[in-house]
């Protein structure tokens, strides 16, 4: 609402509410609302991830533990095509003996 007042040669215009003023005054509330929504979304995502992690951990703990199958020699990355037995031999002279 605009009111014009004449006082002699000067014209004074009084703007009660302008569109820009409303935007400036409400911009803080808009930013606060956006921040609140983002915080709520992040909180929900964290809660969902925590529940998923707990569910997967209990599922892993309840599974029967089976030993890993041995890697076939053809798929072993350390083999160069030659069939060498992977045996560990130790010489008793190499083993230190503790004396008291």
From Swiss-Prot:
It is a single-pass type I membrane protein. Residues 1-28 are extracellular. Keywords: Cell membrane, Glycoprotein, Membrane, Transmembrane, Transmembrane helix. Its main location: membrane. Residues 50-100 are cytoplasmic. Residues 58-100 are annotated as: Disordered. It is found in: Cell membrane. Residues 77-87 have a biased composition (Polar residues). Plays a role in myelin formation. This is Noncompact myelin-associated protein. It comes from Rattus norvegicus. The gene is Ncmap.
């Amino acid at each position: 609402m605009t009111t014009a007042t004449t006082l002699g040669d000067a014209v004074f215009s009084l703007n009660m509410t302008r569109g820009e003023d409303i935007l400036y005054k409400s911009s803080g509330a808009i930013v606060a609302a956006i921040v609140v929504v983002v915080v709520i979304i992040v909180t929900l995502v964290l809660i969902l991830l925590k529940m998923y992690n707990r569910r997967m951990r209990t599922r892993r703990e309840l599974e029967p533990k089976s030993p890993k199958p041995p890697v076939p020699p053809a798929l072993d990355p350390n083999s160069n095509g030659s069939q060498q037995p992977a045996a560990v031999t130790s010489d008793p002279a190499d083993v230190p003996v503790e004396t008291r």
